A protein has these predicted regions:
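Hydrophobic faces of well-ordered beta-strands that scaffold small-molecule active sites
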Residues: 6-11, 34-36, 59-62, 81-82, ...
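Glycine-rich phosphate-binding active-site loops on the catalytic face of alpha/beta enzymes
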Residues: 80, 84-90, 123-133, 169-188
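A contiguous pocket-lining binding segment that forms or flanks enzyme active sites
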Residues: 118-123, 134-136, 141, 146-148
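Hydrophobic positions in alpha-helices of CheY-like receiver
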Residues: 50, 94, 139-142
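Conserved N-terminal beta1-alpha1 strand-loop-helix module at the mouth
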Residues: 1-79, 86, 96, 158, ...
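Histidine/lysine/aspartate-rich catalytic loop segments that bind and position anionic ligands
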Residues: 91-92, 96-130
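C-terminal output/effector regions of signal-responsive regulators
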Residues: 139, 147, 158-164, 169, ...
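Short, charged, surface-exposed secondary-structure boundary motifs
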Residues: 71, 90-94, 111-116, 132-137, ...
Length: 202
């Protein structure tokens, strides 16, 4: 599902005009996997620009909370999407639309709901606030389901990423630390490149 490495840059873009400069910065830094959130009015325009750019990213769309969001994902030909929860209506429709949906889980009940809808991957979110890898181990043990695969997101930075990188059930780590909103808004591409390098070398 992920390309080249486990790092996913989670992006909240408020000004779509910065999209291509941001894309170039990340791509040149070795960041290929993106989770672009549908959190702002200009998110969709930003996603379209990056998707249709010369940069060959592996794009997932985050904060998918409605059927309208799902149809947007489908319209762009994007194969997977994230949500912060396990909304049954969204899970059911994602299956019908052949979208690889990655719902947010933080406890065993969430896992059971997601597995019923054939979710291959689960988003462990918010990872740090939920108790980090220790809590994830408890969830895995309680589930009694073999080969659960997770993408961890929420509060992960260069300081605490190591346990997530080493965990055998975690196939990807999403972080907004690489390109925080303030860095994007101020066009601080130098700092974004620096942070990308730090995580890719972790």
């Amino acid at each position: 599902m992920l390309i080249d490495n486990k790092i996913i840059s989670v992006l909240t873009i408020k000004d779509y005009k910065k999209s291509l400069d941001l894309a170039k910065c990340l791509y040149d830094s070795g960041i290929i996997n993106l989770d672009i959130r549908l959190r702002t009015q200009q998110s969709k325009k930003a996603i379209e620009l990056i998707k249709n750019s010369k940069f060959k990213f592996n794009i997932g769309i985050g904060t998918v909370l409605s059927l309208e969001d799902l149809y947007f994902v489908k319209s762009l030909g994007i194969k997977y999407a994230y949500s912060p929860n396990t909304d049954v209506k969204i899970l059911n429709n994602a299956n019908k639309l052949d979208i690889q949906f990655i719902p947010g889980i933080s406890n065993i009940d969430n896992v059971i709901s997601a597995v019923k809808y054939n979710c291959k991957y689960l988003k462990y979110y918010p990872a740090e606030k939920s108790g980090g890898v220790s809590n994830l181990d408890l969830i895995i043990a309680k589930s009694k389901i073999k080969n659960l695969k997770f993408i961890a997101m929420g509060g992960i930075t260069s300081i605490n990423i190591k346990p997530y990188l080493m965990h055998k059930n975690i196939i990807g780590i999403g972080t907004s630390w690489i390109a925080e909103e303030s860095l994007i808004e101020s066009s601080n591409w130098k700092e974004i490149r620096k942070r990308a390098s730090v995580l890719l070398e972790s």
